[in-house]
Amino acid sequence: MKEVLLESREDKQQVYLPEKCIGCGTCVQICPKGELVIGSVGAVARRLIDKDFIEKRKSGACVFCALCARACPTGALEVRKAGTAEKDDSYLSVALQTTIVNEMCVHCGLCVEVCPQGCIEIKDRRLGEDGSLKMSGRTLIDLNACVHCGWCAAVCPSGAISFQKPFAGEFSRDDNVCQACRTCVHTCPANALFNKEWGPGEIVEKVSHRKDACIYCGACAQACPVRAISVRKIAIIPEMKGKKAFEKKLSDPAPWPTLTSLLKTDEDACLGCGNCVIACPVNAFSDPYLAAGHLNELDDKPLLEVLNGTMKVVNQEVCGSCATCAMICPAEAVWLERREVK
């Protein structure tokens, strides 16, 4: 598994495991020194920028308190002493009940189909040889990838799977602000957000929420380029040391993500079609007329514009780092690159 050494001091190391990170920003929310930075969550989740969710400032203010590692629901941060990670019941990822498959499992494979992380597999599955109408095999869960969403337990026909969620919380989304860019849908680690199918003339909400699947991590709110989503953690579910103090700190609204990307364009490749200008959720939020596709009737656009047949970046600083422009461009003429964290 990939490891990123964020900082080393004397015999202590702060290590980031990006493959376990879900981009929720809980570590950023709880850091008392503001040393950790999260940004470009949508672009990272969509694999449209070469960077990780989390970075660290180089101010030297970190006191190695390990609050970030203790609050992380997936164990993506570690504080090591002499090379050994600290792990006890003051760490949420340790206190969290392991997702377990018991002997009642019939190896049907439904859990494999619905797991949003693809972390379940069935090995050696075959018809039973004891004369019964049963399947034999081994159902295995990659605990490094499990996000404790509960999909597997919900669909299991024999009640063979037990799990525990990290947080209880509240989710809200402003339909008037949401631009249906689907960044949140692509980012959610638990497949708790989706777009309903609709028929001709039918009106449905832009994004729907599966309450029972949500782990209230807040990754969707971190990814939303127009800040239409709010997630509040109201309780930590597992029993862990220092639980009340963590709950108090995490009940505060999470800080907005830092802009850690730059929009880059290739003027020679650009077709001037304007797809990026219309699809950009920041542009669309500025004027519904623009969102409806009226590209040329509006003179002022906040982020992207087509001038003289070529796409131009109007203001880098208002970008939501969702990479919707890069997704829709037919000529790969716009992309995101990492911006250095100050």
Question: PLM features: residue spans?
Answer:
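Post-cleavage N-terminal segment of exported redox proteins
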Residues: 240-241
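Ferredoxin-like iron-sulfur electron-transfer modules
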Residues: 3-23, 41-64, 83-107, 124-148, ...
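Iron-sulfur cluster-binding cysteine motifs and their immediate structural context
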Residues: 26-44, 67-85, 110-127, 151-166, ...
